[in-house]
């Protein structure tokens, strides 16, 4: 029996990701990116090619970021990203992603990026660069908005139960309750 997995934000570690997929015996039908900054999509082409997975992004992100801005960030980081991946699936707030018995709700959490999303389900939320352990995402890139970022966090993420595990795009995991009590940006 084949088990399916979901890859979220395959940054720049295609080999490590594909090794884990192989070791776990997973098939990957879908790659979801929380936002299209290069450090979250760098491995998409290689992982997509190796797994045959479809790529899913929020509709606002697909129109803004999957092209020029990703190339700009790539060149700033010393990388090469001449052929940005094109998504097969456009996501909207409230969509449900179902993979092998797992169900995640798409929460549109713009601010760090116009089409930024978080994925919530099974007592956890993957926040990309929206919410960190005692921090929030940057809002000084083109298309970012600090006001919108804080509003997204307060209305979409802080409404989740306190014991919800938060897995940010960078840094250690935390909980919604811990961030509600101690995040200085909120």
Tell what function each PLM region has.
Residues 1, 12, 38, 61, ...:
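Short, glycine/acidic-enriched loop or turn micro-motifs at the edges of active sites
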Residues 13-96, 184-185:
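Active-site HxH/HxHxD metal-binding segment of metal-dependent hydrolases
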Residues 1-24, 118-127, 132-133:
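Conserved beta-strand hairpin/beta-sheet module of binuclear metal-dependent hydrolase folds
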Residues 1, 23, 49, 159-162:
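Secondary-structure boundary motif
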């Amino acid at each position: 029996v084949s088990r399916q997995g979901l890859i979220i934000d395959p940054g720049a570690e295609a080999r490590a990701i594909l090794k884990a997929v192989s070791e776990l015996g997973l098939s990957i039908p879908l790659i979801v990116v929380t936002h299209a900054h290069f450090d979250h999509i760098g491995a998409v082409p290689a992982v997509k090619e190796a797994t045959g997975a479809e790529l899913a992004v929020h509709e606002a992100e697909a129109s803004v970021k999957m092209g020029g801005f990703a190339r700009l960030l790539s060149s700033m980081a010393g990388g090469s990203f001449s052929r940005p991946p094109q998504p097969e699936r456009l996501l909207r707030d409230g969509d449900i992603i179902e993979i092998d018995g797992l169900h995640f709700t798409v929460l549109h959490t713009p601010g760090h990026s116009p089409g930024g999303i978080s994925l919530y389900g099974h007592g956890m939320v993957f926040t990309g660069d929206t919410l960190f352990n005692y921090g929030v995402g940057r809002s000084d890139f083109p298309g970012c908005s600090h006001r919108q970022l804080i509003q997204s966090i307060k209305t979409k993420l802080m409404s989740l139960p306190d014991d919800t595990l938060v897995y940010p795009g960078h840094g250690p995991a935390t909980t919604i309750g811990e961030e509600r009590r101690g995040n200085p940006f909120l």
